Amino acid sequence: YKMSKTQKILQKLLSANGAKWSKSEFFKDTQIVEDFGDTARETDAILNSSAILHCSHWGRLSFTGKDHQDFLQRMSTNDIESLENGRGIESVFTEAKGRVIDLATLYHKAETTLCIVSPDSSKELSDWLSKYTFSEEMTITNKEAQNEMIEIWGPKTKHVIYSAFNIDI
């Protein structure tokens, strides 16, 4: 397993803040943060400041094309077509008999919907969805190798995002 440049930068940043890494027993070829060594400090950061959660082991599928929202509407349990630009929604992908294939969070921006799915399930979900793609003009792309993912929690999240990325949310 070879880490990308972005993974190395993220790992260095998190390690500098006390992250203890371990190889995941559940997610292949994945290093995850076990903890930062002080549960009380971690809890305090989430409640009073901000905390970064490394989530790169979660799956990320990008849906593009003029038919992708209609397709997702038919294949999942929530109202994807009413999802506004810049917003997100939780949904479930199920088989015809109701068996859950995966839980997902979908974010819509412009002509793309990003689908966050369970770790190690991107390929299975993409393959399953492809079986039901016939004449739809759309593309499903696995984005896991192209980017990293973090969550930022806590009341000072806006400040952290602005300071780190110069984005005002």
Model-derived regions: residue spans:
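Basic, glycine/lysine-rich polyanion-binding surfaces/domains
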Residues: 2-169
